Amino acid sequence: MKFGSFLFSPEKVEGFDFHVYRLKPETGVIGTPKEDMYNNIACFGDNVNAQKHPEWVAVSKDGPALRTNGKYNFRWDILCMTNPEYRAWILDFIENAAKVASGITLSSIHFADHGFCVCPRCVELWRQSGLNWVDWRVQTVTNFIREARIRVKKWGKPFFVGLLPDPVLSKERFGIDFDALAPYADAFIVPIFSKSYATAWHFETLARSFKHVLKKPVYINIYVYGPGDKPNEVPTVSELLKVSARVARTGVDGILFLAENAQRLIDFQKAAIQAEETLQEISGYGSEEFMKLIDRWKKLF
């Protein structure tokens, strides 16, 4: 089992097996590709381009794929997948990052949600395909991932595909068919982000479900401390330890920890090894690999 950092800054944190830099998060703010790290790219979640090019935003009968649309649970603005100009640009961006990075992880690779996208271009492409609506959306997502993989593998780099945490309806909602994507992904990353992990069994159930249905290695991404967060808005150290231990015992292949920067993650490491009461509790959870990680952290501080 491997453990990784997942940061908005191009920094490494000692005590982890690998490191991911959010080169292009859903905010749309773009950094510089970083060598000796995995680079993460949010594909169709892009607040900056949604603001610059409102005509690129995915649309539905219930409104656009914007954070302001209360009929959906959008945490960022989402672009139409079939926009040829943006699609070509993001594929080139992925390849340019792959030239430099240790590997590439993608997120926001899908349609916004059920009902998207019904722009004239998408409707016409769907009709021309001869497929039903669900199958056309699956084909669109899968073809994008296939092309992205070609760009990454041209440079001989690992290729991880990020999903959304819905193990049942991802196909119908987002056009994500787990089996169709499996031949192209070296591994899958599933974010189970929350600002509270008080009900850890729920997140354990999600992790266990994804390990069961996915046909490639599975990495679970856990939320520690995001940009702009205040201390009272993030999970407690006890919650993070318990949910990590529970997820680790599900048989997943690894866990990533998202944080704003290296210092936020170091602060978590230091607090974790001092949480003696919680560590005593989780020592009985049957999560040997996670407890070994804690032992590694103890040697650092």
Which sequence ranges carry the predicted segments?
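Substrate-binding cleft of secreted/luminal carbohydrate-active enzymes
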Residues: 192-199, 221-301
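Catalytic domains of carbohydrate-active enzymes, especially glycoside hydrolases
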Residues: 1-31, 96-105, 181-187, 246-255
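Alpha-helical scaffolding within the catalytic cores
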Residues: 25-27, 170-179, 201-210
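Active-site-proximal loop/short-helix segments
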Residues: 105-132
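Aromatic-lined carbohydrate-recognition surfaces of secreted/lumenal glycan-active proteins
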Residues: 1-8, 135-175, 217-229, 260
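The substrate-binding groove and active-site-proximal loops of carbohydrate-active enzymes
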Residues: 6, 19-21, 72-88, 132-139, ...
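Active-site-adjacent "subsite" loops/lids of carbohydrate-active enzymes
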Residues: 39-96, 243
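Substrate-binding cleft/loops of secretory-pathway carbohydrate-active enzymes
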Residues: 13-14, 158-198, 232
